[in-house]
Amino acid sequence: MNNLRQEFIKFSVDTGVLRFGEFVTKAGRTSPYFFNAGLFNQGGTLARLADFYAQTLIDSGVEFDMLFGPAYKGITLASATAVALANKGRDVPFAFNRKEAKDHGEGGTMVGAKLQGRVVIIDDVISAGTSVRESVDMIRAAGATPCAVLIALDRMERSGADDALSAYSAVQEVSNTYGMPVISIGNLSDLFEYLSNAGADSEQAQYRDAVSAYRKRYGVT
């Protein structure tokens, strides 16, 4: 058992970011759980989340020089993670992009430190991989090297329509396409372990079978 990963799942449940029930995903699937990182919307919870990101990145052993947060959620995540890393003795620069180019002041679409060296892309989840693809293009265009993607939760789900499921998840496809690791604080296996360890009379225990069935249908190995 990885205590950090289990602590993160519990933290997400306790803050209401990770909920159980019936939810329709972007892919049109009915999922027994829903993870909404936008609900990490208070200073204290954001600080704790950033600490999870920072510690996970340190523990991964990935060598990096700076952070990049794609607009919009990635902006806050990269900024907060940079603060958390500095508090752990690793002071690194960070940058993020605007959705719309600015034609006055410093101009352009990039904000923060100059993109250079080995860059870690920070986001909440990977659904279709669009945000990562755009980030990789921007980083490479600046002459820097994307070296890893760091996300909060890996759903470990096979991509594609129900009648044409891929053998790979969106996370695996990103890793294979760009030849770099995708690191997650927690994943579906951690979530299932959390439910399996929940007491029989706990609120979460009732969702164990639903998550197990969902993982059997859509999960990757």
From Swiss-Prot:
Positions that bind orotate: F34, F35, S127, R155
Superkingdom assignment: Bacteria
Per the record, the pathway is: Pyrimidine metabolism; UMP biosynthesis via de novo pathway; UMP from orotate: step 1/2
Using the record, list the residue span of the signal peptide; answer none if the entry has no such feature.
none
Q: Name one Pfam family in it.
A: Pribosyltran
User: Which cofactors, by name?
Assistant: Mg(2+)
Q: Which UniProt keywords apply?
A: Glycosyltransferase, Magnesium, Pyrimidine biosynthesis, Transferase
Keyword Magnesium in annotation: yes
The UniProt subunit note reads as follows: Homodimer.
Task: Indicate the family of this protein.
Answer: Belongs to the purine/pyrimidine phosphoribosyltransferase family. PyrE subfamily.
Q: What does this protein do?
A: Catalyzes the transfer of a ribosyl phosphate group from 5-phosphoribose 1-diphosphate to orotate, leading to the formation of orotidine monophosphate (OMP).
- This chain's protein is named Orotate phosphoribosyltransferase
